[in-house]
Amino acid sequence: MSKFARIIGTGSYLPPTVITNDDLSKTINTTNEWIVARTGIKQRHKVTNETTCDLAEKAANRALEMAGINVKDLDLIILATTTADKIFPATATILQTAIGASCPAFDLQSVCAGFIFALTTAEQYIKASAANKVLVVGSETLSRIVNWNDRSTAVLFGDGAGAVVLSGSDNTGILYSKLFSDGNYLSSLQVSNNYINEVGFIEMSGNEVFKIAVNRLSSLAEKTLKETNLNSNKLDWIVPHQANIRIISAVAKRIKTPMNKVIVTLENHGNTSAASIPLALDTAVRDGRIKRGDHLLFEGIGAGFSWGSILIQF
């Protein structure tokens, strides 16, 4: 039985079509300056013909390549997504076939907290000796459910995918995880229509989401550090859900962590929901900021609301 679940490979993928803030200003009442000041986002990526599985496949293959394992060594695949390619089967099973795996595969839907929930689930499989190698992917094509005429949401969301490969370890890995949900705030952030029968778009009460996100994530970050006896100055990096620079900055300030210890990539891809944490992680691993042995705090909140944190020694 492994004591820890350790990340041994990361990967990410963004579709080639880029929508800049200036592009958006041609169709809705906004400006680059307005968007950057309120969100920190400069551009987002948008699929043309690619599916959620297509993005996931590319990110997964890059993570598997870094991990240096054969796809047949995978014991489980968990795909976190809000934008599944079909009502059924699970997009994870389509991904399984696409990459040539033969293990069980399932989807997990917890919106922007999806990767946190999926990674925690994978950790439990490994610690219970039900799996040793697990592929966890966050992949989204949110452009399919964005109303591009709604300034409050069109400026925020983008498409992309990120992936990690987890392996059992006796030495280091995930040290702590905590998950929460509270369904009392359903109307604050949702796709209102029944998408099985109707076309629905993301609807959001921005001010309420901001307040709840900052409060919940700050409290959870403080709780995580306290329960693991880790001072914030011993934390090497925060890798947050890339939702909004104001939320990210407010949480960092509450736990007395300077922004130069926070991985921020949302300016290049916007809010990619379940893909955002693994996207940011892969970027920082590949550019050398995150190194083996670093203590990382993942934290994110999504509609529902559902939120969670993971402390990991990379």
Curated annotation (Swiss-Prot):
Q: Which UniProt keywords apply?
A: Acyltransferase, Cytoplasm, Fatty acid biosynthesis, Fatty acid metabolism, Lipid biosynthesis, Lipid metabolism, Multifunctional enzyme, Transferase
Q: What chemistry does it catalyse, as a reaction equation?
A: malonyl-[ACP] + acetyl-CoA + H(+) = 3-oxobutanoyl-[ACP] + CO2 + CoA
Question: GO cellular component annotations, sorted alphabetically?
Answer: cytoplasm
Q: Which residues form the signal peptide?
A: none
Disulfide bridge partners, by residue number: none
Q: Which InterPro entries match?
A: ACP_syn_III_C, ACP_syn_III_N, FabH, Thiolase-like
Q: What class of enzyme is it?
A: transferase
Report the GO molecular function annotations. 3-oxoacyl-[acyl-carrier-protein] synthase activity; beta-ketoacyl-acyl-carrier-protein synthase III activity
Q: Where is the segment annotated ACP-binding?
A: 242-246
Q: What does this protein do?
A: Catalyzes the condensation reaction of fatty acid synthesis by the addition to an acyl acceptor of two carbons from malonyl-ACP. Catalyzes the first condensation reaction which initiates fatty acid synthesis and may therefore play a role in governing the total rate of fatty acid production. Possesses both acetoacetyl-ACP synthase and acetyl transacylase activities. Its substrate specificity determines the biosynthesis of branched-chain and/or straight-chain of fatty acids.
Quoted from the entry, the domain comment is: The last Arg residue of the ACP-binding site is essential for the weak association between ACP/AcpP and FabH.
Q: How does it assemble?
A: Homodimer.
Q: Which family does it belong to?
A: Belongs to the thiolase-like superfamily. FabH family.
The name on file for this protein is Beta-ketoacyl-[acyl-carrier-protein] synthase III
The major lineage groups are:
Bacteria, Pseudomonadati, Pseudomonadota, Gammaproteobacteria, Candidatus Pseudothioglobaceae
